[in-house]
């Protein structure tokens, strides 16, 4: 492990320090919440961090680790804030849509409940029916009618 760390450049080691500090912070947070099952990871991370910092001090590289870690954490928090703001915007949009829908439904109910005005019907003048004169039927007429309707055959 030491040989691998010593083979890395200063920039790579500095990035590794920020990553290890971030992981250590994350592990401590999970431990406090009771989500961390393997607590030995914290010890290993501290040891690796100490090795990297030792190599950097041997090379006389002055590194303000706290500033780097804080900037790394700030970037992560900014990303989380952006995600939260996007979620809030979506929630507001959904809430507005629900309100608009409720208003539309309420208006529709009002329209249905309102009495409808009576439609004016136009009176159409009807022509009086012609009365047909009915001739009284006599026996002679009945015979003629029956004769006309009988089929020949």
UniProtKB/Swiss-Prot annotation:
Give a GO biological-process term: translation
The cross-references to InterPro entries, in alphabetical order and at most eight, read:
Ribosomal_protein_uL29, Ribosomal_uL29, Ribosomal_uL29_CS, Ribosomal_uL29_sf
Q: Where is the composition biased (Basic and acidic residues)?
A: 100-121
Task: Enumerate the residue ranges of region (Unknown).
Answer: 84-153
- The question of whether Ribosomal protein is a record keyword is answered with yes
Q: Does the keyword Membrane apply?
A: no
Comp. bias regions, Basic residues: 140-153
Sorted keywords for this record are: Ribonucleoprotein, Ribosomal protein
Alphabetically, the GO molecular function entries are: structural constituent of ribosome
Write out the ranges of the annotated region (Large ribosomal subunit protein uL29).
Answer: 1-83
Give the record's family classification.
Belongs to the universal ribosomal protein uL29 family.
What is this protein called in UniProt? Large ribosomal subunit protein uL29
* Organism encoding this protein: Mycoplasmoides gallisepticum (strain R(low / passage 15 / clone 2)) (Mycoplasma gallisepticum)
Q: Which gene encodes it?
A: rpmC
